[in-house]
Regions:
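FMN-binding flavodoxin-like domain, especially the glycine-rich phosphate-binding loop
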Residues: 1-127
């Protein structure tokens, strides 16, 4: 089985419980978001935790790095998990990340986005 590279942006208690269970059967290596510029050809899972106030500086730095290095994810295949403390921003931030990573060369096949808002009300909605 091919190695999965986890790119974690932010932390939340719910995401910390979810990731070990979701990734238990996969070989996983974690890559700091600051090192994303040298990631070509990998299978990526972006795990983003957003507090009630919106994206933090690490998320913005990740987007800027991807935009400054337009081919850095060439040959990558990705998926995105966004966990939000509130009801706002999760879908918008996920779309922003997918678009920016796609422009940097990462493919997102199928339905690559899983988002959870604070109340998990949106879990019956497919993005």
């Amino acid at each position: 089985m091919e190695m999965l590279t986890l790119v974690r942006i932010g932390r939340s208690a719910r995401l910390e419980r979810l990731l070990p269970a979701a990734l238990a059967e996969f070989p996983v290596t974690e890559l700091p978001a600051e090192q994303i510029a040298s990631t070509a050809g990998r299978r990526l899972l972006f795990a983003v935790a957003v507090d009630a106030y919106g994206p933090d500086e690490a998320f913005v730095r990740l987007l800027r790095t991807l935009r400054q290095n337009p081919d850095c994810l060439c040959g990558c295949i990705g998926g995105v998990i966004v966990d939000g403390a509130g009801e706002l921003d999760t879908k918008q931030l996920a779309r922003q990340l997918v678009l920016t990573a796609n422009l940097a060369g990462c493919a997102f096949p199928g339905k690559p986005l899983v988002e959870g808002t604070g109340s998990l009300y949106n879990q019956h909605i497919q993005a």
